[in-house]
Design a protein with these regions (language model features):
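Non-catalytic, glycine-rich low-complexity segments
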Residues: 1-31, 121
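Aromatic-rich carbohydrate-binding modules that target alpha-glucans
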Residues: 20-73, 83-105
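Extracellular/periplasmic catalytic domains that process cell-envelope and extracellular macromolecules
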Residues: 28-30, 71-72, 147-152, 180-181, ...
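Exposed beta-strand face motif in extracellular beta-rich ectodomains
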Residues: 74-78
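Extended, polar beta-sheet/loop recognition surfaces of beta-rich domains
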Residues: 86-142
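Aromatic-anchored helix/helix-loop segment that forms the rim or "lid"
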Residues: 422-446
Length: 503
């Protein structure tokens, strides 16, 4: 009817009315021939009625539909049904939804982790999105948290799956006193935005506005964050914007089925990454659509969940400059401009938010980013492992500090081998066999780590001398590269060991 849609405004019109919007203009200016919405509100029946058939707004490049007479307290599942005449029909969820239903994995989530989950609809096909008009407003006990040591925080990197026996955000909440008493200033959660499946490191994201149900409900995440704030600890999210999986709606909407990757006309993704580090589908960060999406997502996480900062994964890949292994770390002015833009967006939403990049580029580029107030990961694993094993060669700690203390130094991370394991395998003399000696060596490492000015990060259980390999299986009985991202042994019993507890 010629109505123009503002895709930036809230889609909740009133207590019973919602407008859904789907942008589908490709890089050549083309769009799908038709679009419908299937959902609980129309019994998943494909019709040309006003509660199913979407209207076209060419000026905005999108399809839209307004749904009336809805129940404000009910969760509605829905999908878009789009296609071209004589071509492929696609059913996909909404990229901006805050909850999804996954028929292949939801049944594996324990009720204790996600109670009363909405049942998957009979009319659905694949992942479906969910909305509810009336938001579940959360009563924050600490509405305006401020970090105690923003310049030199001690950050604890945590993977929820491998931190407690129930693998959940609620389980982690029960351990906050342990972390607080240890002196932790901030907890950095490995990716918790919806990823493919339930068992993952989380670097395979598909829905960025929904937090993964495998760890808990939105309220449980907020309970955890609020409890951290009450205890004086910040919460940092590890976010992945270098890429997304093929389940991400922006990827599915413009997909090359023959080549099993994003199509050439996709306005969000590259068909092939210009850099050598990509996995899954590579975002084109020079696209205004991608920039807008990422900024909107960052602001949402800051506002809705009161996150205190972000660790950006693989920022070296935020570029359209073609490179190889030999040149990817070279100074890239275009990449710097993109990253500064995202940093500015975070600061505009929350002026005291921490921004950390996993960058690993040449010194000039990292120094320019550091001058903006951005922190950068500084990998000291090799040197500290050498020291832990009792070997002098390559054990220098000089790379931990620069005149500008913007490097987040770490001895271990989720992505590096554990010092305790290396001690048992390649330690010098008695270090291989004697636990008290190993622990004393790790304590010496800590003394030459935490006394250096600047932000510091420790990997979970490193404080107890965790000595299972990064490539260990769940039982700790086998070590192989195939187990790298698999579940790991959870050893809270270490804390009952007087020698380990001393560390």
């Amino acid at each position: 009817d010629g109505k123009q849609v503002d895709t930036e405004e809230d889609n909740v019109i009133n207590n019973t009315t919602v407008t859904l919007v789907l942008y589908d203009k490709d890089t050549e200016g083309n769009h799908k021939d038709f679009a419908h919405v299937l959902g609980d509100f129309n019994n998943w029946e494909l019709t040309n009625k006003e509660d199913c058939q979407m209207c076209r707004d060419d000026a905005a490049g999108c399809w839209w539909i307004t749904l009336n007479n809805l129940n404000p307290t009910k969760e509605y599942a829905f999908q878009y049904y789009v296609g071209t005449k004589g071509g492929e029909v696609i059913r996909l969820a909404d990229a901006y939804c805050e909850k999804i239903l996954d028929p292949g994995h939801d049944d594996d989530i324990p009720a204790s982790t996600y109670p009363d989950n909405k049942r998957y609809p009979k009319g659905g096909k694949g992942i479906v999105s969910v909305f509810k008009i009336q938001r579940d407003n959360y009563a924050w006990s600490v509405p305006d948290f401020k970090m105690q040591h923003p310049k030199q925080p001690v950050i604890y990197e945590m993977h929820l799956r491998d931190f407690t026996a129930d693998h959940s955000i609620s389980g982690a909440l029960q351990k906050l006193d342990y972390l607080k008493n240890m002196g932790v200033d901030a907890i950095e959660l490995m990716p918790v935005q919806e990823f493919d499946g339930n068992d993952s490191w989380g670097y395979n994201p598909c829905f960025f506005f929904a937090l993964d149900k495998a760890y808990g409900t939105p309220k449980m995440y907020k309970d955890f964050i609020d409890a951290c704030h009450r205890k004086g600890m910040a919460v940092i999210l590890d976010v992945v914007y270098n890429h997304a999986t093929g389940n991400m709606p922006f990827a599915r909407l413009y997909w090359d089925s023959a080549k099993n990757k994003t199509a050439r006309n996709n306005p969000y993704f590259n068909t092939d990454a210009p850099h050598p580090y990509s996995v899954f589908q590579d975002f084109n960060h020079e696209s205004p659509l991608v920039r807008k999406f990422v900024k909107r997502n960052l602001k949402f996480l800051l506002d809705e969940y009161k996150i205190d900062g972000f660790r950006f994964d693989l920022t070296k890949g935020f570029t359209q400059t073609a490179s190889t292994e030999a040149t990817a770390s070279n100074y890239d002015a275009a990449r710097i401009a993109i990253l500064k833009d995202y940093h500015s967006a975070v600061k505009a939403a929350k002026s005291d938010a921490l921004v950390i990049f996993e960058h690993f580029c040449e010194k000039k580029e990292e120094q320019e980013l550091a001058a903006e107030g951005i922190y950068l990961w500084r990998n000291m694993n090799n040197a500290y492992c050498q020291s832990a094993m009792g070997w002098k060669e390559n054990s220098g700690f000089d790379g931990l500090y620069e005149s500008t203390p913007s490097w987040v130094g770490f001895m271990e991370s989720h992505d590096e081998e554990r010092m305790g394991y290396k001690q048992t395998q390649w330690g010098n003399g008695v270090l291989q066999t004697d636990l008290p000696t190993r622990i004393r060596q790790l304590a010496a490492n800590a003394a030459f780590f935490f006394t250096v000015p600047g932000p510091k990060m420790i990997w979970q259980f490193g404080e107890l001398g965790y000595d299972f390999s990064i490539n260990s299986n769940e039982t700790g009985t086998a070590v192989s590269e195939e187990y790298r991202t698999s579940r790991k042994p959870i050893r809270w019993g270490y804390y009952e060991n007087a020698t380990r507890k001393e560390l």
